[in-house]
Regions:
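AMP-binding/adenylate-forming catalytic domain of the ANL superfamily
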Residues: 130-131, 503-528
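Conserved pre-ATP/AMP-binding loop-to-beta segment of ANL
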Residues: 18, 151-171, 177-178, 183, ...
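Conserved AMP-binding/adenylation subdomain of ANL enzymes
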Residues: 190-225, 229-273
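Conserved AMP-binding/adenylate-forming core of the ANL superfamily
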Residues: 18-63, 70, 88-93, 147
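Conserved AMP-binding/adenylate-forming
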Residues: 245, 301-431, 437-440, 453-454
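Conserved AMP-binding A3 loop
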Residues: 30-32, 167-195, 199-203
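Structural core segment of the AMP-binding/adenylate-forming
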Residues: 47, 75-149
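AMP-binding/adenylate-forming catalytic core of the ANL superfamily
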Residues: 87, 93-94, 104-106, 262, ...
Protein backbone atom coordinates (compact mmCIF):
# COMPACT_ATOMS: atom_id res chain seq x y z
CA UNK A 1 0.00 0.00 0.00
CA UNK A 2 0.98 3.61 -0.63
CA UNK A 3 -0.30 6.93 0.74
CA UNK A 4 -2.63 7.07 -2.25
CA UNK A 5 -6.40 7.60 -2.31
CA UNK A 6 -7.12 4.39 -4.21
CA UNK A 7 -4.85 2.27 -2.00
CA UNK A 8 -6.28 3.63 1.26
CA UNK A 9 -9.86 3.18 0.01
CA UNK A 10 -9.17 -0.41 -1.04
CA UNK A 11 -7.53 -1.06 2.32
CA UNK A 12 -10.71 0.08 4.06
CA UNK A 13 -12.85 -2.07 1.75
CA UNK A 14 -10.77 -5.13 2.65
CA UNK A 15 -11.23 -4.43 6.36
CA UNK A 16 -14.98 -3.61 6.45
CA UNK A 17 -16.48 -4.88 3.15
CA UNK A 18 -20.05 -5.32 4.37
CA UNK A 19 -20.29 -1.97 6.16
CA UNK A 20 -22.55 0.61 4.48
CA UNK A 21 -20.44 3.20 2.66
CA UNK A 22 -22.85 5.58 0.97
CA UNK A 23 -26.57 6.41 0.98
CA UNK A 24 -28.34 8.45 -1.71
CA UNK A 25 -32.13 8.45 -1.38
CA UNK A 26 -33.23 4.83 -1.65
CA UNK A 27 -29.84 3.66 -2.98
CA UNK A 28 -27.47 2.16 -0.44
CA UNK A 29 -24.06 0.67 -1.20
CA UNK A 30 -21.69 -1.24 1.04
CA UNK A 31 -17.94 -0.68 0.79
CA UNK A 32 -17.68 -3.89 -1.24
CA UNK A 33 -20.38 -2.73 -3.66
CA UNK A 34 -18.93 0.77 -4.02
CA UNK A 35 -15.51 -0.74 -4.70
CA UNK A 36 -16.95 -3.07 -7.33
CA UNK A 37 -18.70 -0.27 -9.25
CA UNK A 38 -15.60 1.92 -9.00
CA UNK A 39 -13.52 -0.95 -10.40
CA UNK A 40 -15.94 -1.28 -13.31
CA UNK A 41 -15.58 2.45 -13.98
CA UNK A 42 -11.77 2.17 -13.85
CA UNK A 43 -11.74 -0.76 -16.27
CA UNK A 44 -14.07 1.11 -18.64
CA UNK A 45 -11.82 4.18 -18.56
CA UNK A 46 -8.81 2.03 -19.39
CA UNK A 47 -10.59 0.63 -22.45
CA UNK A 48 -11.35 4.19 -23.58
CA UNK A 49 -7.62 4.79 -23.68
CA UNK A 50 -7.37 6.80 -20.47
CA UNK A 51 -3.89 6.54 -18.99
CA UNK A 52 -2.04 7.50 -15.82
CA UNK A 53 -2.14 11.28 -15.48
CA UNK A 54 -5.06 11.78 -17.89
CA UNK A 55 -7.63 14.37 -16.81
CA UNK A 56 -11.28 13.28 -16.48
CA UNK A 57 -14.02 15.89 -16.05
CA UNK A 58 -17.02 15.32 -13.75
CA UNK A 59 -19.93 17.65 -14.52
CA UNK A 60 -22.83 16.73 -12.26
CA UNK A 61 -24.88 17.51 -9.20
CA UNK A 62 -24.21 15.31 -6.18
CA UNK A 63 -24.92 11.67 -6.89
CA UNK A 64 -23.37 8.28 -6.20
CA UNK A 65 -21.98 8.21 -9.74
CA UNK A 66 -19.86 11.29 -8.91
CA UNK A 67 -18.08 9.28 -6.22
CA UNK A 68 -17.82 6.09 -8.30
CA UNK A 69 -16.20 8.00 -11.17
CA UNK A 70 -13.86 9.85 -8.80
CA UNK A 71 -12.71 6.63 -7.13
CA UNK A 72 -12.46 4.78 -10.45
CA UNK A 73 -10.30 7.56 -11.85
CA UNK A 74 -7.94 7.37 -8.87
CA UNK A 75 -7.72 3.59 -9.24
CA UNK A 76 -6.35 4.14 -12.75
CA UNK A 77 -3.97 6.87 -11.50
CA UNK A 78 -5.81 9.37 -13.68
CA UNK A 79 -6.99 12.72 -12.28
CA UNK A 80 -10.65 13.77 -11.82
CA UNK A 81 -11.40 17.42 -12.60
CA UNK A 82 -14.29 19.07 -10.76
CA UNK A 83 -16.57 21.16 -13.00
CA UNK A 84 -18.94 23.79 -11.63
CA UNK A 85 -22.46 22.89 -12.79
CA UNK A 86 -23.48 26.55 -12.58
CA UNK A 87 -21.11 27.68 -15.30
CA UNK A 88 -22.38 29.08 -18.59
CA UNK A 89 -20.89 27.80 -21.83
CA UNK A 90 -17.96 30.23 -22.06
CA UNK A 91 -16.89 29.42 -18.51
CA UNK A 92 -17.21 25.68 -19.13
CA UNK A 93 -15.17 25.93 -22.29
CA UNK A 94 -12.41 27.83 -20.50
CA UNK A 95 -12.15 25.36 -17.61
CA UNK A 96 -12.28 22.20 -19.73
CA UNK A 97 -9.66 23.61 -22.09
CA UNK A 98 -7.41 24.91 -19.31
CA UNK A 99 -7.61 21.58 -17.46
CA UNK A 100 -6.76 19.50 -20.58
CA UNK A 101 -9.80 17.28 -20.02
CA UNK A 102 -9.77 14.19 -22.26
CA UNK A 103 -13.06 12.58 -21.21
CA UNK A 104 -16.09 14.06 -19.50
CA UNK A 105 -18.82 12.45 -17.42
CA UNK A 106 -21.89 14.70 -17.44
CA UNK A 107 -25.47 14.47 -16.26
CA UNK A 108 -28.09 14.32 -18.99
CA UNK A 109 -29.52 17.74 -18.10
CA UNK A 110 -26.25 19.33 -19.28
CA UNK A 111 -26.29 17.71 -22.73
CA UNK A 112 -27.15 20.89 -24.62
CA UNK A 113 -24.25 22.83 -23.10
CA UNK A 114 -21.81 20.02 -23.86
CA UNK A 115 -23.11 19.82 -27.43
CA UNK A 116 -22.62 23.55 -27.91
CA UNK A 117 -18.98 23.64 -26.80
CA UNK A 118 -17.52 20.25 -27.75
CA UNK A 119 -16.35 21.31 -31.22
CA UNK A 120 -14.16 24.01 -29.64
CA UNK A 121 -12.39 21.46 -27.41
CA UNK A 122 -10.19 19.26 -29.63
CA UNK A 123 -8.58 17.40 -26.71
CA UNK A 124 -11.99 16.27 -25.39
CA UNK A 125 -12.62 12.90 -27.05
CA UNK A 126 -15.03 10.90 -24.87
CA UNK A 127 -18.49 11.91 -23.63
CA UNK A 128 -20.20 9.75 -21.00
CA UNK A 129 -23.76 10.63 -20.00
CA UNK A 130 -25.09 9.98 -16.48
CA UNK A 131 -28.86 9.44 -16.60
CA UNK A 132 -30.41 11.84 -14.08
CA UNK A 133 -34.04 11.35 -15.09
CA UNK A 134 -34.27 14.61 -17.04
CA UNK A 135 -35.07 15.15 -20.72
CA UNK A 136 -31.56 16.50 -21.21
CA UNK A 137 -32.04 18.44 -24.42
CA UNK A 138 -29.79 17.72 -27.39
CA UNK A 139 -28.10 14.34 -27.53
CA UNK A 140 -24.31 14.59 -27.74
CA UNK A 141 -23.01 12.81 -30.83
CA UNK A 142 -21.14 9.58 -30.07
CA UNK A 143 -21.98 9.85 -26.37
CA UNK A 144 -21.79 6.81 -24.13
CA UNK A 145 -24.23 5.89 -21.37
CA UNK A 146 -22.52 5.47 -18.00
CA UNK A 147 -24.47 2.38 -16.92
CA UNK A 148 -24.08 0.85 -20.37
CA UNK A 149 -20.37 1.64 -20.34
CA UNK A 150 -19.68 -0.21 -17.10
CA UNK A 151 -22.34 -2.95 -17.39
CA UNK A 152 -20.08 -5.69 -18.74
CA UNK A 153 -16.83 -4.55 -17.16
CA UNK A 154 -14.95 -6.60 -14.60
CA UNK A 155 -15.39 -5.88 -10.90
CA UNK A 156 -11.76 -6.87 -10.35
CA UNK A 157 -9.22 -4.28 -9.29
CA UNK A 158 -6.71 -2.96 -11.79
CA UNK A 159 -3.09 -3.89 -11.25
CA UNK A 160 -1.63 -0.39 -11.39
CA UNK A 161 1.51 0.89 -9.70
CA UNK A 162 0.35 3.78 -7.53
CA UNK A 163 2.36 6.29 -5.56
CA UNK A 164 2.10 9.09 -3.06
CA UNK A 165 3.55 11.21 -5.87
CA UNK A 166 0.44 10.76 -8.04
CA UNK A 167 -1.47 14.00 -8.46
CA UNK A 168 -4.72 15.43 -7.16
CA UNK A 169 -6.10 18.58 -8.81
CA UNK A 170 -8.87 20.80 -7.49
CA UNK A 171 -10.23 23.62 -9.62
CA UNK A 172 -11.26 26.64 -7.62
CA UNK A 173 -13.52 29.43 -8.81
CA UNK A 174 -10.60 31.74 -8.02
CA UNK A 175 -10.36 35.00 -6.13
CA UNK A 176 -7.95 36.64 -8.53
CA UNK A 177 -9.37 35.83 -11.94
CA UNK A 178 -10.37 32.76 -13.90
CA UNK A 179 -10.59 29.26 -12.35
CA UNK A 180 -7.25 27.75 -11.36
CA UNK A 181 -6.26 24.14 -10.82
CA UNK A 182 -4.49 23.57 -7.49
CA UNK A 183 -2.06 20.67 -7.95
CA UNK A 184 -1.25 18.49 -4.92
CA UNK A 185 0.88 15.40 -4.42
CA UNK A 186 -1.51 12.64 -3.42
CA UNK A 187 0.30 12.00 -0.13
CA UNK A 188 0.18 15.68 0.78
CA UNK A 189 -3.53 16.02 0.12
CA UNK A 190 -4.24 12.89 2.17
CA UNK A 191 -2.26 14.26 5.10
CA UNK A 192 -3.81 17.72 4.94
CA UNK A 193 -7.37 16.97 3.86
CA UNK A 194 -7.95 13.23 3.94
CA UNK A 195 -7.45 12.43 7.61
CA UNK A 196 -3.88 11.16 7.32
CA UNK A 197 -2.86 13.00 10.48
CA UNK A 198 -4.16 11.55 13.74
CA UNK A 199 -6.70 14.01 15.15
CA UNK A 200 -5.77 13.12 18.74
CA UNK A 201 -1.96 13.02 18.59
CA UNK A 202 -1.44 15.44 15.69
CA UNK A 203 1.03 12.94 14.23
CA UNK A 204 1.04 11.51 10.72
CA UNK A 205 -0.01 7.85 10.51
CA UNK A 206 3.30 5.95 10.13
CA UNK A 207 2.12 3.61 7.36
CA UNK A 208 -0.77 3.42 4.88
CA UNK A 209 -1.90 0.29 6.71
CA UNK A 210 -2.15 2.20 9.99
CA UNK A 211 -4.10 4.90 8.17
CA UNK A 212 -6.61 2.35 6.84
CA UNK A 213 -6.92 0.74 10.29
CA UNK A 214 -8.89 3.82 11.42
CA UNK A 215 -11.95 2.17 9.91
CA UNK A 216 -11.90 -0.52 12.61
CA UNK A 217 -13.33 1.99 15.09
CA UNK A 218 -17.07 2.46 15.59
CA UNK A 219 -18.73 3.86 12.48
CA UNK A 220 -19.65 7.55 12.21
CA UNK A 221 -22.53 8.66 9.97
CA UNK A 222 -21.78 11.86 8.03
CA UNK A 223 -24.11 13.96 5.87
CA UNK A 224 -22.74 15.69 2.75
CA UNK A 225 -24.61 18.89 1.86
CA UNK A 226 -21.98 20.80 -0.12
CA UNK A 227 -21.61 19.93 -3.83
CA UNK A 228 -18.77 17.56 -4.72
CA UNK A 229 -17.62 20.13 -7.29
CA UNK A 230 -16.32 22.03 -4.22
CA UNK A 231 -13.20 20.93 -2.41
CA UNK A 232 -14.89 20.87 0.98
CA UNK A 233 -17.31 18.13 -0.06
CA UNK A 234 -14.60 16.08 -1.78
CA UNK A 235 -12.49 16.25 1.35
CA UNK A 236 -15.47 15.21 3.45
CA UNK A 237 -15.83 12.14 1.23
CA UNK A 238 -12.10 11.40 1.69
CA UNK A 239 -12.43 11.58 5.47
CA UNK A 240 -15.55 9.42 5.40
CA UNK A 241 -14.30 6.67 3.11
CA UNK A 242 -10.77 6.53 4.56
CA UNK A 243 -12.26 6.19 8.07
CA UNK A 244 -14.92 3.61 7.21
CA UNK A 245 -17.78 6.02 7.84
CA UNK A 246 -21.20 6.00 6.23
CA UNK A 247 -21.61 9.01 3.91
CA UNK A 248 -25.19 10.19 3.36
CA UNK A 249 -25.72 12.41 0.30
CA UNK A 250 -28.57 14.90 0.03
CA UNK A 251 -30.60 13.56 -2.91
CA UNK A 252 -32.33 16.87 -3.67
CA UNK A 253 -30.79 19.35 -6.12
CA UNK A 254 -32.24 22.29 -4.17
CA UNK A 255 -31.62 23.02 -0.51
CA UNK A 256 -34.64 22.16 1.67
CA UNK A 257 -33.80 22.63 5.35
CA UNK A 258 -36.88 20.71 6.57
CA UNK A 259 -35.85 17.74 4.44
CA UNK A 260 -32.28 17.89 5.76
CA UNK A 261 -33.44 17.58 9.35
CA UNK A 262 -35.58 14.59 8.31
CA UNK A 263 -32.47 12.93 6.84
CA UNK A 264 -30.55 13.61 10.06
CA UNK A 265 -33.28 11.88 12.07
CA UNK A 266 -33.82 8.98 9.65
CA UNK A 267 -30.15 8.11 9.13
CA UNK A 268 -29.06 9.04 12.66
CA UNK A 269 -26.47 11.44 11.29
CA UNK A 270 -23.64 12.23 13.70
CA UNK A 271 -21.51 14.63 11.64
CA UNK A 272 -23.09 17.39 9.52
CA UNK A 273 -21.02 19.76 7.34
CA UNK A 274 -22.42 22.96 5.81
CA UNK A 275 -21.11 25.97 3.87
CA UNK A 276 -21.65 28.93 6.15
CA UNK A 277 -24.76 31.00 6.70
CA UNK A 278 -26.33 30.19 3.33
CA UNK A 279 -27.03 26.71 4.70
CA UNK A 280 -26.75 27.49 8.40
CA UNK A 281 -29.50 30.10 8.58
CA UNK A 282 -32.27 28.04 6.90
CA UNK A 283 -31.28 25.01 8.99
CA UNK A 284 -31.42 27.19 12.09
CA UNK A 285 -34.84 28.58 11.12
CA UNK A 286 -36.21 25.10 10.43
CA UNK A 287 -34.83 23.54 13.61
CA UNK A 288 -37.68 24.49 16.01
CA UNK A 289 -40.25 23.04 13.62
CA UNK A 290 -38.25 19.84 13.22
CA UNK A 291 -38.13 19.33 16.97
CA UNK A 292 -41.81 20.23 17.31
CA UNK A 293 -42.64 17.48 14.81
CA UNK A 294 -40.86 15.06 17.12
CA UNK A 295 -37.79 14.39 14.98
CA UNK A 296 -35.07 12.70 17.04
CA UNK A 297 -31.86 14.65 16.35
CA UNK A 298 -29.97 13.34 19.37
CA UNK A 299 -27.48 11.43 17.21
CA UNK A 300 -25.94 14.68 15.91
CA UNK A 301 -22.87 15.80 17.85
CA UNK A 302 -20.64 17.59 15.29
CA UNK A 303 -21.96 20.47 13.17
CA UNK A 304 -19.16 22.00 11.10
CA UNK A 305 -18.90 24.77 8.54
CA UNK A 306 -16.38 25.50 5.79
CA UNK A 307 -15.93 27.91 2.87
CA UNK A 308 -18.02 30.81 4.14
CA UNK A 309 -18.98 32.93 7.16
CA UNK A 310 -20.81 31.04 9.92
CA UNK A 311 -22.34 33.75 12.09
CA UNK A 312 -22.10 33.48 15.89
CA UNK A 313 -25.79 34.40 16.24
CA UNK A 314 -26.75 31.34 14.21
CA UNK A 315 -24.41 29.13 16.24
CA UNK A 316 -25.89 30.41 19.49
CA UNK A 317 -29.45 29.76 18.34
CA UNK A 318 -28.65 26.22 17.18
CA UNK A 319 -27.04 25.50 20.54
CA UNK A 320 -30.16 26.67 22.35
CA UNK A 321 -32.04 23.81 20.70
CA UNK A 322 -29.21 21.25 20.49
CA UNK A 323 -27.04 22.05 23.53
CA UNK A 324 -24.80 18.98 23.23
CA UNK A 325 -23.41 19.94 19.82
CA UNK A 326 -19.84 20.81 18.94
CA UNK A 327 -20.04 23.59 16.33
CA UNK A 328 -16.82 23.76 14.32
CA UNK A 329 -15.90 26.71 12.11
CA UNK A 330 -13.00 25.84 9.78
CA UNK A 331 -10.74 28.46 8.22
CA UNK A 332 -8.93 27.51 5.03
CA UNK A 333 -8.82 27.42 1.25
CA UNK A 334 -8.26 25.17 -1.75
CA UNK A 335 -4.55 26.02 -1.52
CA UNK A 336 -4.13 25.10 2.15
CA UNK A 337 -6.94 22.97 3.48
CA UNK A 338 -7.75 24.00 7.03
CA UNK A 339 -5.42 26.60 8.53
CA UNK A 340 -7.37 26.71 11.77
CA UNK A 341 -10.67 25.93 13.46
CA UNK A 342 -12.70 27.31 16.30
CA UNK A 343 -15.08 25.22 18.37
CA UNK A 344 -18.33 26.65 19.68
CA UNK A 345 -20.20 24.86 22.47
CA UNK A 346 -23.09 25.71 24.75
CA UNK A 347 -20.73 26.23 27.68
CA UNK A 348 -17.83 27.75 25.77
CA UNK A 349 -19.12 30.29 23.27
CA UNK A 350 -16.51 32.21 21.32
CA UNK A 351 -16.91 35.91 20.74
CA UNK A 352 -16.22 37.73 17.49
CA UNK A 353 -12.92 39.54 17.41
CA UNK A 354 -11.35 41.78 14.80
CA UNK A 355 -14.09 41.17 12.27
CA UNK A 356 -13.39 37.50 11.70
CA UNK A 357 -13.17 34.03 13.25
CA UNK A 358 -10.79 33.60 16.16
CA UNK A 359 -8.93 30.32 16.50
CA UNK A 360 -6.03 28.67 18.31
CA UNK A 361 -2.83 28.62 16.26
CA UNK A 362 -2.15 25.11 14.93
CA UNK A 363 1.47 24.01 14.59
CA UNK A 364 1.27 24.04 10.77
CA UNK A 365 0.04 27.63 10.43
CA UNK A 366 1.94 30.92 10.65
CA UNK A 367 1.31 34.59 9.90
CA UNK A 368 3.89 35.95 7.46
CA UNK A 369 5.05 39.44 6.63
CA UNK A 370 5.53 39.13 2.87
CA UNK A 371 7.46 42.40 2.65
CA UNK A 372 10.24 41.07 4.89
CA UNK A 373 9.57 37.31 4.55
CA UNK A 374 9.55 37.12 8.34
CA UNK A 375 7.31 35.02 10.54
CA UNK A 376 5.19 37.26 12.77
CA UNK A 377 5.40 36.13 16.40
CA UNK A 378 2.35 35.67 18.67
CA UNK A 379 3.45 38.52 20.96
CA UNK A 380 3.11 40.96 18.03
CA UNK A 381 -0.57 41.90 18.18
CA UNK A 382 -0.31 44.96 15.94
CA UNK A 383 1.07 43.63 12.67
CA UNK A 384 -1.34 42.23 10.10
CA UNK A 385 0.11 39.58 7.82
CA UNK A 386 -0.79 36.72 5.53
CA UNK A 387 -2.09 33.48 6.96
CA UNK A 388 0.12 30.66 5.68
CA UNK A 389 0.26 26.89 5.96
CA UNK A 390 3.48 24.88 5.92
CA UNK A 391 4.32 21.20 5.61
CA UNK A 392 1.98 19.26 3.35
CA UNK A 393 1.02 21.96 0.85
CA UNK A 394 0.26 22.01 -2.91
CA UNK A 395 2.91 21.87 -5.61
CA UNK A 396 1.61 24.61 -7.91
CA UNK A 397 -1.26 26.00 -9.90
CA UNK A 398 -1.81 24.02 -13.08
CA UNK A 399 -0.17 25.79 -16.02
CA UNK A 400 0.28 29.05 -14.09
CA UNK A 401 3.94 29.43 -13.15
CA UNK A 402 3.71 33.14 -12.36
CA UNK A 403 0.86 32.77 -9.86
CA UNK A 404 2.47 29.65 -8.39
CA UNK A 405 5.66 31.55 -7.52
CA UNK A 406 3.62 34.14 -5.60
CA UNK A 407 1.45 31.67 -3.69
CA UNK A 408 3.81 28.78 -2.90
CA UNK A 409 7.00 30.23 -1.46
CA UNK A 410 9.96 29.18 0.66
CA UNK A 411 10.80 30.86 3.98
CA UNK A 412 13.73 29.69 6.11
CA UNK A 413 14.02 26.53 4.05
CA UNK A 414 10.36 25.54 4.44
CA UNK A 415 7.60 25.71 1.82
CA UNK A 416 4.47 27.72 2.57
CA UNK A 417 1.14 28.13 0.85
CA UNK A 418 -0.22 31.69 1.03
CA UNK A 419 -3.62 32.05 -0.67
CA UNK A 420 -4.16 35.66 0.42
CA UNK A 421 -6.06 35.58 3.72
CA UNK A 422 -5.04 38.30 6.17
CA UNK A 423 -4.72 37.60 9.89
CA UNK A 424 -3.29 38.93 13.16
CA UNK A 425 -2.58 37.72 16.67
CA UNK A 426 -4.72 38.61 19.68
CA UNK A 427 -3.54 39.30 23.23
CA UNK A 428 -4.40 35.73 24.26
CA UNK A 429 -2.17 34.29 21.52
CA UNK A 430 -5.02 33.25 19.27
CA UNK A 431 -5.29 34.18 15.60
CA UNK A 432 -8.04 36.28 14.06
CA UNK A 433 -8.86 35.90 10.38
CA UNK A 434 -9.46 39.34 8.91
CA UNK A 435 -10.39 38.31 5.39
CA UNK A 436 -9.01 37.89 1.89
CA UNK A 437 -6.54 40.51 0.88
CA UNK A 438 -8.13 40.77 -2.54
CA UNK A 439 -11.56 42.21 -3.28
CA UNK A 440 -13.22 38.89 -4.03
CA UNK A 441 -16.78 38.34 -2.89
CA UNK A 442 -17.81 35.21 -0.97
CA UNK A 443 -21.53 34.64 -1.45
CA UNK A 444 -22.91 31.45 0.05
CA UNK A 445 -19.53 29.72 -0.27
CA UNK A 446 -19.04 30.77 -3.89
CA UNK A 447 -16.09 33.05 -4.55
CA UNK A 448 -16.92 35.73 -7.11
CA UNK A 449 -14.34 37.94 -8.84
CA UNK A 450 -15.61 41.51 -9.42
CA UNK A 451 -13.75 42.23 -12.67
CA UNK A 452 -15.38 39.27 -14.40
CA UNK A 453 -18.85 40.50 -13.39
CA UNK A 454 -18.02 44.09 -14.38
CA UNK A 455 -16.95 43.00 -17.83
CA UNK A 456 -20.20 41.10 -18.32
CA UNK A 457 -22.33 44.03 -17.11
CA UNK A 458 -20.59 46.43 -19.46
CA UNK A 459 -21.93 44.44 -22.39
CA UNK A 460 -25.21 46.29 -21.80
CA UNK A 461 -25.45 49.36 -24.00
CA UNK A 462 -26.45 51.72 -21.18
CA UNK A 463 -23.64 50.79 -18.77
CA UNK A 464 -20.84 53.34 -19.12
CA UNK A 465 -18.78 52.17 -16.16
CA UNK A 466 -19.31 50.05 -13.09
CA UNK A 467 -17.68 48.49 -10.05
CA UNK A 468 -18.87 45.37 -8.27
CA UNK A 469 -18.56 44.83 -4.51
CA UNK A 470 -19.89 42.49 -1.85
CA UNK A 471 -22.08 43.85 0.93
CA UNK A 472 -23.23 42.11 4.11
CA UNK A 473 -26.22 39.80 3.75
CA UNK A 474 -27.86 37.63 6.41
CA UNK A 475 -28.54 34.70 4.10
CA UNK A 476 -25.49 34.66 1.83
CA UNK A 477 -22.80 36.23 4.02
CA UNK A 478 -22.21 38.69 1.20
CA UNK A 479 -24.33 39.62 -1.79
CA UNK A 480 -23.15 41.08 -5.07
CA UNK A 481 -23.98 44.75 -5.63
CA UNK A 482 -23.10 46.72 -8.77
CA UNK A 483 -22.39 50.46 -8.62
CA UNK A 484 -23.23 51.71 -12.11
CA UNK A 485 -22.64 54.87 -14.08
CA UNK A 486 -25.20 55.02 -16.91
CA UNK A 487 -24.54 56.34 -20.39
CA UNK A 488 -27.75 58.36 -20.22
CA UNK A 489 -30.67 58.84 -17.86
CA UNK A 490 -32.83 56.13 -19.38
CA UNK A 491 -34.13 53.53 -16.96
CA UNK A 492 -31.87 50.55 -16.36
CA UNK A 493 -33.40 47.55 -14.63
CA UNK A 494 -31.67 44.66 -12.86
CA UNK A 495 -33.43 42.01 -14.95
CA UNK A 496 -32.23 43.68 -18.16
CA UNK A 497 -28.66 43.62 -16.87
CA UNK A 498 -28.93 39.96 -15.92
CA UNK A 499 -30.27 39.04 -19.34
CA UNK A 500 -27.44 40.88 -21.07
CA UNK A 501 -24.75 39.37 -18.83
CA UNK A 502 -26.11 35.80 -18.82
CA UNK A 503 -24.11 34.99 -21.95
CA UNK A 504 -20.86 35.53 -20.09
CA UNK A 505 -21.28 34.58 -16.42
CA UNK A 506 -23.26 32.13 -14.30
CA UNK A 507 -26.38 33.23 -12.48
CA UNK A 508 -24.85 33.08 -9.01
CA UNK A 509 -22.36 35.80 -10.01
CA UNK A 510 -25.11 38.25 -11.00
CA UNK A 511 -25.75 41.37 -8.88
CA UNK A 512 -28.59 41.01 -6.43
CA UNK A 513 -28.95 44.80 -6.33
CA UNK A 514 -27.74 47.81 -8.31
CA UNK A 515 -27.12 51.41 -7.25
CA UNK A 516 -26.40 54.36 -9.51
CA UNK A 517 -23.72 57.03 -9.36
CA UNK A 518 -22.99 60.01 -11.61
CA UNK A 519 -19.35 58.98 -11.78
CA UNK A 520 -17.23 55.95 -10.88
CA UNK A 521 -14.17 56.87 -8.83
CA UNK A 522 -10.89 55.54 -10.18
CA UNK A 523 -7.21 56.37 -9.70
CA UNK A 524 -5.50 58.42 -12.41
CA UNK A 525 -4.03 55.18 -13.72
CA UNK A 526 -7.53 53.85 -14.22
CA UNK A 527 -7.37 51.40 -11.32
CA UNK A 528 -10.71 51.01 -9.53
CA UNK A 529 -11.39 52.50 -6.12
CA UNK A 530 -13.16 49.58 -4.49
CA UNK A 531 -13.07 51.19 -1.06
CA UNK A 532 -15.17 54.06 -2.40
CA UNK A 533 -17.53 51.66 -4.18
CA UNK A 534 -18.02 49.63 -1.00
CA UNK A 535 -18.78 52.72 1.08
CA UNK A 536 -21.08 54.14 -1.59
CA UNK A 537 -23.06 50.90 -1.93
CA UNK A 538 -23.42 50.55 1.84
CA UNK A 539 -24.70 54.12 2.18
CA UNK A 540 -27.22 53.75 -0.65
CA UNK A 541 -28.51 50.48 0.78
CA UNK A 542 -28.41 51.69 4.42
CA UNK A 543 -25.99 48.94 5.42
CA UNK A 544 -23.76 49.69 8.39
Amino acid sequence: MEFNAADIFEGVVDRVPEREAVVYGSTRLTYKELDARSNKAANALKKLGIKKGSHIGIYAFNCIEWLEIMLGTYKLCAIPININYRYVEEELKYLIDNADVEAIFYQKQFSTKINNIKDDLPLLKDFVCINDGTDGGDIVENNLDFEGLIANESESRLMVERSGDDQYILYTGGTTGMPKGVVWRMEDVLMTLGGGIDAVTGEKYPTPEAFADKCLQDQTVALALAPFMHGGAQWQSFNSFFSGWKLVINDQASFDADYIWEIVAKEKVMNLTIMGDAMGRPLCDALPGALKKGLDLSSLFVFSSTASVFSPSIKDTILEYLPNLFLIDAVGSSETGATGVNIHTKDGKLKDSGGGPKFTKPNFSEILNLDTLEIIQPDDTETIGYLARKGHVPMAYYKDEEKSKKTFIEVNGERYSIPGDMAKYEEDGQMTLLGRGSVSINSGGEKIFPEEVEMALKAHSNVFDCLVVGVKDEKWGQKVVAVIQRRDEQDLFLNDLKESASKYIAGYKMPKEIVFSEIIERAPSGKPNYQWAQSYANSKLNIK
